[in-house]
Amino acid sequence: MTAREGSVGGTPLPRGTALLREPLLNKGTAFSAAERDALGLRGLLPPRINTQADQVSRVLENFRRKPTDLDKYINLAALHDRNETLFYRVVVDNPDEMMPIIYTPTVGQACQQFGHIFQRPRGLFVSIEDLGRVEAVLRNWPHRDVAMIVVTDGERILGLGDQGADGMGIPVGKLSLYTA
């Protein structure tokens, strides 16, 4: 079995809907027939198998139909939450179109609307209530192989003033650019 079909580094992959909810591993409709069988995905996805290029084309078509930059930001955030590989392929292949959406200027508006557009947690929130427990909070991060972090206190986000936890869009956006 390939890494996608059974395990990564000896760790078994999640199966079925658990795999489809894991953005680091989910390939959406790009899972092959063999992968669908091995990973319990048959019947959980539309039967047609798409290439990543097909998926990119569909993402761009949907993205370009969005009426506002904030709608485009929400669309890309949802993709990021579903399929990170596809998200980064779209960003890398279309930087001029994507960068102003995932970072400035749109990320400022996204931070201001964070409480209204929040869909899935990204990042690690450390607050004053965590005083004396920061190490325990850091241990809650699910990934051990961390190559880079971006930290903000939420103050003076893009000249917008103190955004507090709503400023999380800044480190998420920066890491998206650095990763791409």
Which sequence ranges carry the predicted segments?
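Metallocofactor- and cofactor-centric catalytic cores in central/energy metabolism, strongly enriched
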Residues: 2-180
